[in-house]
A protein has these predicted regions:
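Beta-strand->loop->alpha-helix junctions that form or flank phosphate-binding loops
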Residues: 198-199, 211-233, 251-255, 278, ...
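C-terminal helical cap/extension that packs against the catalytic core
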Residues: 201-211, 215-220, 235-236, 308-311, ...
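Nucleotide phosphate-binding/pyrophosphate-handling subdomain across enzymes
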Residues: 139-144, 152-162, 166-170, 180, ...
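ATP-dependent carboxylate-amine ligase catalytic core
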Residues: 22-29, 33-45, 70-156, 172-174, ...
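Hydrophobic alpha-helical packing residues
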Residues: 64-69, 132, 380, 426
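Short functional linear segments
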Residues: 1-53, 60-62, 66-71
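Extended acidic/charged loop-beta regions that coordinate divalent cations
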Residues: 81, 124-173, 206-247
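Short internal beta-strands
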Residues: 78, 194-199, 337-339, 358-366
Length: 430
């Protein structure tokens, strides 16, 4: 098999949450331990940082990786989902794993793993951990796929655990209340390993404190001593006035990045105190070069050409509580939103947050889990939102561009898969 065929095999032969949802979820770590043992426990050959949370874990993971790279480390980065290329999930110093490595891994190891019937994420996690060991990384930043306690990444013992925040998402797996979801996320807390919690509320804080106490793990709540004192956008990026690091310029835009920055800088303080980050100036350099160093896409990402347009992967109620005000704050004659969602998200409550003073281009991403564009449009109309139907993200975006005046603003999002389809279509252009 070539690379394209190998990736199709991975998607078609293993249950993939991104494609089929709940049927891909495996409750337990037996397969993860079996794969780990088969490959000789590769994750024990380098240090790790474990990042969980409902929102913000991707931005936080990439920023920490960028800072560690600026500090001179060889850094593995494991995140999900990918937007355009499967290999975005597994990087070393920002460089994606070679296509040949993926092909060779499947060809050489399928006789072992096929009888296990692993999920897609179990297999890709094993692939990542093995690759990082062979690449002799110093440290790997590992993003949790779903939840924490039973996530297949939870076989590692990191030097720092990070929980960005908790909100209601993936309730079919993690529980329907904030304390239930917090219990699952708190499952990444390990004995004697410090943990940073970015955001907590009255319902979740005791859950984290109890787990940390049981594990004898120091716990630090970023909100108790905020590192970010003020933040605002500049033409060069997002500028932060901080308690311990002076003025920082971040290349990740979006108002929600202020919360992420608070979590990241609290985590950085722990890594500095442990000697993992050796040079404080690395924080400044890493902060301003996240996209260049790690290849992160889809976070309030400017799109080429005119009018002003951005895409963002925000996909749940908590995400839209931050995105909607920022969209409305954009100086524009009209706002045009290309919008679609997948069927495990709270469509009704997200609709309640969407800007009323906007024209919508309802669409659906190319995943079996997508809400049909007709259903999204129907829900939109019930909430006083109006627009047109389009069978694909690319067609919806083209329609928005055709309708837009030079001083309009276009937003593309509602799901990671909407952004993925958009970026893939833009790359296909000659």
């Amino acid at each position: 098999m070539n690379y394209k065929e190998t990736v199709e095999y991975l998607f078609n032969s293993t249950p993939v949450f991104e494609h089929v949802g709940a049927t891909a979820y495996k409750d337990g770590l037996d397969n993860s331990h079996a794969l780990d043992a088969h490959f000789g426990h590769p994750h024990t050959r380098y240090q790790t940082i474990h990042v969980a949370g409902t929102n913000g874990k991707g931005s936080s993971s990439h920023t920490l990786a960028s800072i560690l790279q600026a500090d001179g480390h060889r850094v593995g980065l494991y995140t999900s989902p990918h937007l355009v290329d499967f290999r975005e999930r597994i990087r070393v110093n920002g460089v994606m794993m070679p296509e040949e490595y993926v092909v060779d891994f499947v060809r050489e190891e399928r006789s072992f793993f096929e009888p296990l019937h692993p999920s897609f994420f179990e297999l890709t996690t094993a692939l990542a951990f093995k690759y990082f060991a062979e690449q002799e990384v110093d440290i790997a930043v590992v993003e949790v796929g779903l939840g924490g306690r039973l996530d297949c990444t939870n076989i590692i013992t990191p030097q720092l655990s990070i929980i960005t925040n908790i909100s209601v998402d993936h309730t079919q797996f993690l529980g329907h209340t904030l304390p239930e979801i917090a219990h699952e996320k708190a499952g990444i807390i390990k004995p004697h390993v410090p943990v940073v919690v970015g955001e907590a509320v009255a319902e979740t804080r005791p859950v984290f404190e109890a787990k940390a106490h049981a594990c004898e793990s120091p716990i630090f709540f970023a909100e108790d001593r905020p590192e970010v004192l003020a933040a605002h956008d500049t033409p060069e990026g997002r500028e932060y006035e901080t308690r311990s690091f002076g003025t920082l310029l971040g290349d990740l835009r979006g108002d929600y990045q202020t919360r992420n920055a608070n979590t990241i800088l609290t985590s950085v303080s722990q890594l500095l105190s442990r000697g993992t980050i050796r040079h404080p100036e690395s924080v400044r350099e890493g902060f301003r070069s996240v996209c260049r160093r790690t290849g992160l896409m889809g976070r309030w990402q400017p799109l080429p050409g005119h009018p002003h347009a951005v895409c963002d992967t925000g996909h749940n109620v908590a995400g839209w509580q931050m995105l909607a005000p920022q969209i409305m704050a954009q100086p524009a004659r009209k706002r045009r939103l290309v919008f679609g969602m997948v069927d495990d998200k709270d469509l009704t409550h997200v609709m309640e947050l969407l800007p009323r003073e906007a024209t919508y281009y309802w669409t659906q991403p190319s995943t079996h889990r997508a809400f049909p564009a007709e259903k999204v449009a129907e829900c939109g109309r019930a909430h006083g939102l109006h627009g047109s139907l389009h069978p694909s993200v690319a067609e919806a975006y083209r329609a928005a561009l055709a309708d837009a005046a030079p001083d309009d603003f276009i937003f593309v999002g509602g799901s990671s898969y909407v952004v993925a389809d958009l970026l893939a279509s833009l790359q296909e252009k000659p």
